[in-house]
Structure formats: structure tokens, C-alpha cells
Amino acid sequence: MGKITFYEDRGFQGRHYECSTDHSNLQPYFSRCNSVRVDSGCWMLYEQPNFTGCQYFLRRGDYPDYQQWMGFSDSVRSCRLIPHSSSHRIRIYEREDYRGQMVEITDDCPHLQDRFHFSDFHSFHVMEGYWVLYEMPNYRGRQYLLRPGEYRRYHDWGAMNARVGSLRRIMDFY
């Protein structure tokens, strides 16, 4: 069970809303989000309703302003609690529709291009666990939640291009 609290103002001030489950539309509860406290669980925040727009991965901790979670603005319109997973396995492919070279990963990878020498990553098959895909190396840039399932092309995980720099397992030890 997870618990997250959204605050309208920085520094955990102003109107707040406590949440313990997925919400496809947070707009009725607050107009802006400038700070967040994650008491338990791992969460993906979305800039738009229905789990769309920019995504931000948060684990247990305090985030006194939106820049602390690499947010571009104070807009948080939906959230998803990420289930705990004890094992992680993902296959990454050089081309769309699982074509080209394939590599299977079971651990975090801060620099995919250096490790595997692919110039692009066009499809993924998440066999086990939940992962965060980052646009740039060293877990920077836009973030995308990968749940168990198939991602045949970059549009399937919500990206505008096939730029992938790093990949991290979602693990909650708290």
C-alpha cells in the first residue's frame, strides 16, 4: 500500500490532498502541485489527466518543490502507484517490432549506448518488473514508466523519438 500527499504550495504548504491509489484525474482535488511527500511506495506522476504527458518517478521522500522531481511545471493531473516487484527482466531491441539486435537486462543501466553499442532503441519487451526509461544517460531527461508488456515502437511508451539513455528498475525497499 502506498501513500502520497500533494501540496499546492512549495515547502508542503497550502491545500493538500492525500492519495493511496491510482488516480486518472487529480484536477478536482488541487489546482497546482508545488511539493509532494511520499510516505510509502513508488509513484509515477503525470502532467496530464489519464496518465499522459510528462512523467515523473518518485520514491519515498520529501520533494519541497517540483524541480526536486525534475518537473517542468507545477502541473500534476494524474498518478499511478507502482506495484512492488522482486524480479526484473527486460529485452531491448535495436529496431521496431522486436527486430535487429536484442539484449536482455536484469539490472540498472546508467548508459545504454556505452554498454550495448546501439545508436537507437526502438522496442522493448518487459518480461518482469517495472522500469523507468530515461531519455538521457545517468538517469536524466524525460522519464517513461515501462510496465510488464510489449512496446513495439517508441510511441507505445509515450515518447516522441527513440532516444533512450538509461534504464532503471523500480525497487522499493521501504
From Swiss-Prot:
One of its GO terms (biological process) is lens development in camera-type eye. Detected in the superior olivary complex and fibers of the ventral aoustic stria of the auditory hindbrain. GO terms for molecular function: structural constituent of eye lens. Belongs to the beta/gamma-crystallin family. The keyword Membrane does not apply. There are six different gamma crystallins identified in rat lens. Has a two-domain beta-structure, folded into four very similar Greek key motifs. Keywords: Eye lens protein, Repeat. Pfam families: Crystall (PF00030). Residues 84-87 are annotated as: Connecting peptide. Residues 2-40, 41-83, 88-128, 129-171 form the Beta/gamma crystallin 'Greek key' domain. Crystallins are the dominant structural components of the vertebrate eye lens. The keyword Isomerase does not apply. Gene3D superfamilies: Crystallins. This is Gamma-crystallin E.
